[in-house]
Amino acid sequence: MPIISKVVARQILDSRGNPTVEVDVYTESSFGRAAVPSGASTGVHEAVELRDGDASVYLGKGVLKAVENVNTVISDALEGMLVTEQEEIDEMLLALDGTPNKSNLGANALLGVSLACARAGAEYTGLPLYRYIGGTMANTLPVPMMNVLNGGAHADNTVDFQEFMIMPAGFTSFSDALRAGAEIFHSLKALLKSKGLSTAVGDEGGFAPNLRSNEEAIELVIEAIGKAGYKVGSPTDKGGLGDAQVMIALDPASSEFYDAAKKRYVFKKSSKQELTSTEMAEYWERWVNTYPIISIEDGMAEDDWEGWKLLTDKVGSRVQLVGDDLFVTNSIRLADGINRKVANSILIKVNQIGTLTETLQAINLARLNGYTSVISHRSGETEDSTIAQIAVATNAGQIKTGSMSRSDRMAKYNELLRIEEELGSQARYPGKAAFRV
């Protein structure tokens, strides 16, 4: 019987050198391990990541309280349960915590246990994790959303918007799409060098040069795509699609430069201009009409519902509008957004909600209502590749897991290459069909 015999947590370090939680789950015949990521720009509605707060140790970012919660309260409750009963395990975790935002035991404690149990369950059944979670129809490799140029909270430069990304959707296999992404990344590096700009990389592996404007950033990415020999879409195409091989995606992380007191979007790092919600929506409409943009994540602030509705009405039929801080992988907030008819896609970050079951519920709710799902990493990552498995398990069709550098990002891409090889002729790369615009 796959009975949980031991649950052990420890404090390890993430890709930014900050502590995070790693959990091991044992049964008599299987083992599972999971490490928990953390974000830099976090939404106020996310589940609570429990930190120790002792400034003398890891600058207050230690996670020994969360580790202790796993090794005592959670371990005592889970030992003796069947590791293959994922929903029951996650229900137990939620009951043990007893708060709506996981602030008692910590979402980082709960998530580590939840994912480690899934890993142990998959090993017990002899199935790869994507098959264990998704069943026999799990065969879709995701279109990568590659963060090649950084600004905002991810970089010390004069660019307000956090992420400028490429999406190589015009290919027939994940491996070919990944190759194109890597070639464009190196093309961009050479282009930056030729202009005397920095090629240092940010938390997610993208470049963070000191540019004059947000416009210069997107124009550099478009130029790099062309220099790599690939066709980028035209803004006259629907969403920049047409016969394009590569499209542009943005994550401005608008909550980071929204002044709630003024009710203005303040471009603090570049022009210093201040925009109302209406003006911000019009700004994005101009960009969509000018550049080959297929996806905008967090184009408006997390609680600016009016702004989100304006943006959705203006460009939602042409562009994927992804809610990250808006929805925080939370089915309740997603349902609210669906009822308000805002956005058309949800970013899925497992640590925003805290358990695998709740993550899958959010993905299913999105699918039932015609919203796409983008499985995502965090800026503070580990070598754990579970999100790659989840992307295939759910046939989500899109993954956001950084640029073409830093081994914590490459771990996910390499895992997807292995899965594609394992699936063989069953592997499906959705390409432009990943978008519903």
From Swiss-Prot:
<dbReference type="GO" id="GO:0000015">
    <property type="term" value="C:phosphopyruvate hydratase complex"/>
</dbReference>
<feature type="binding site">
    <location>
        <position position="379"/>
    </location>
    <ligand>
        <name>(2R)-2-phosphoglycerate</name>
    </ligand>
</feature>
<dbReference type="GO" id="GO:0000287">
    <property type="term" value="F:magnesium ion binding"/>
</dbReference>
<keyword id="KW-0456">Lyase</keyword>
<keyword id="KW-0963">Cytoplasm</keyword>
<dbReference type="GO" id="GO:0009986">
    <property type="term" value="C:cell surface"/>
</dbReference>
<dbReference type="InterPro" id="IPR020810">
    <property type="entry name" value="Enolase_C"/>
</dbReference>
<keyword id="KW-0324">Glycolysis</keyword>
<dbReference type="InterPro" id="IPR020809">
    <property type="entry name" value="Enolase_CS"/>
</dbReference>
<comment type="similarity">
    <text>Belongs to the enolase family.</text>
</comment>
<comment type="function">
    <text>Catalyzes the reversible conversion of 2-phosphoglycerate (2-PG) into phosphoenolpyruvate (PEP). It is essential for the degradation of carbohydrates via glycolysis.</text>
</comment>
<keyword id="KW-0479">Metal-binding</keyword>
<keyword id="KW-0964">Secreted</keyword>
<feature type="binding site">
    <location>
        <position position="297"/>
    </location>
    <ligand>
        <name>Mg(2+)</name>
    </ligand>
</feature>
<dbReference type="Pfam" id="PF00113">
    <property type="entry name" value="Enolase_C"/>
</dbReference>
<feature type="binding site">
    <location>
        <position position="251"/>
    </location>
    <ligand>
        <name>Mg(2+)</name>
    </ligand>
</feature>
<comment type="pathway">
    <text>Carbohydrate degradation; glycolysis; pyruvate from D-glyceraldehyde 3-phosphate: step 4/5.</text>
</comment>
<feature type="binding site">
    <location>
        <position position="349"/>
    </location>
    <ligand>
        <name>(2R)-2-phosphoglycerate</name>
    </ligand>
</feature>
<dbReference type="GO" id="GO:0006096">
    <property type="term" value="P:glycolytic process"/>
</dbReference>
<feature type="binding site">
    <location>
        <position position="162"/>
    </location>
    <ligand>
        <name>(2R)-2-phosphoglycerate</name>
    </ligand>
</feature>
<dbReference type="Pfam" id="PF03952">
    <property type="entry name" value="Enolase_N"/>
</dbReference>
<feature type="binding site">
    <location>
        <position position="324"/>
    </location>
    <ligand>
        <name>Mg(2+)</name>
    </ligand>
</feature>
<feature type="binding site">
    <location>
        <position position="400"/>
    </location>
    <ligand>
        <name>(2R)-2-phosphoglycerate</name>
    </ligand>
</feature>
<feature type="active site" description="Proton donor">
    <location>
        <position position="204"/>
    </location>
</feature>
<feature type="binding site">
    <location>
        <position position="378"/>
    </location>
    <ligand>
        <name>(2R)-2-phosphoglycerate</name>
    </ligand>
</feature>
<dbReference type="InterPro" id="IPR029017">
    <property type="entry name" value="Enolase-like_N"/>
</dbReference>
<dbReference type="GO" id="GO:0005576">
    <property type="term" value="C:extracellular region"/>
</dbReference>
<keyword id="KW-0460">Magnesium</keyword>
<feature type="active site" description="Proton acceptor">
    <location>
        <position position="349"/>
    </location>
</feature>
<protein>
    <recommendedName>
        <fullName>Enolase</fullName>
        <ecNumber>4.2.1.11</ecNumber>
    </recommendedName>
</protein>
<dbReference type="GO" id="GO:0004634">
    <property type="term" value="F:phosphopyruvate hydratase activity"/>
</dbReference>
<dbReference type="InterPro" id="IPR000941">
    <property type="entry name" value="Enolase"/>
</dbReference>
<dbReference type="InterPro" id="IPR020811">
    <property type="entry name" value="Enolase_N"/>
</dbReference>
<dbReference type="InterPro" id="IPR036849">
    <property type="entry name" value="Enolase-like_C_sf"/>
</dbReference>
